[in-house]
Amino acid sequence: MRNTLLKLILGGIGAFMMCPVNAQVDEFSSWTGVKVSYGITSRLKASGHLEFRSKDNFKEADRLGMTLGLNYKMNSWLRMEGSYEFHYRNVSGRPWKARHRYKVGATGSVAWNEVKFSLRELFQETFFRGEVENRLRSRLKVSYEPEKWLVKPYYSTELYQPIGDDAFFTAARIRYRPGVVIAFSKQYALDVFYCRQYEPKGSRNIVGLEFQLSF
């Protein structure tokens, strides 16, 4: 059963990776980050995240980011969360600019044997250069998490929808993300992933590493 489930997940990832891309010129980027989580109580956790992103085929810095957040476990299947983000962005041809963002949302999850399914809904509001942008983010994720395995694969799809205008039923952004979490111990892990990001103006191929610490 384990081998069958693993083949299904990896097969789906492989099929996605082999899909033909559109005719737009794609850009390659990288995301590198460190995330620290701390359990305040058995239900409440605080987290901090530092991240660096590149763009233009790894030639330019895109942004530096910091996130502070809280999440609360309501019950065995529902978790609430909220966070604040600060970005220092490289606006090509202009001075770097600061951007502020907050997010609130919830994640519901269920497990079947060692396969975990989750659906996350987030409201996101961003303040940048005197403008406000609102988005609804919907992410569906499936992961295979055998307790004794060091490497645990996952795949997620996330949809960004505009809020506050007639374009709600359009996709401002879609992210397809296969990856693996390498669990060195209960406290230390490394998330290695590829993300295909689609936007109407163009697409990005993103490779990422995130070091995770839990206390």
Task: Give a label for each model feature.
Residues 1-28, 215:
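Bacterial Sec-dependent N-terminal signal peptides
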Residues 22-25, 54-59, 91-97, 127-131, ...:
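Outer-membrane beta-barrel domain signature
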Residues 24-81:
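Start-of-domain marker
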Residues 28-30, 62-64, 98-102, 132-136, ...:
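Residues that define the transmembrane beta-barrel architecture of outer-membrane proteins
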Residues 50-56, 84-90, 110-114, 123-127, ...:
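Transmembrane beta-strands of outer-membrane beta-barrel pores
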Residues 155, 166-167, 171-215:
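Predominantly the C-terminal beta-signal and adjacent terminal strand-loop region
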Residues 42-48, 77-82, 113-117, 148-153, ...:
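Repeated loop/turn-to-beta-strand initiation elements of outer-membrane beta-barrel proteins
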Residues 34-38, 68-72, 104-110, 138-144, ...:
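Residues on the lipid-exposed face of transmembrane beta-strands in outer-membrane beta-barrel proteins
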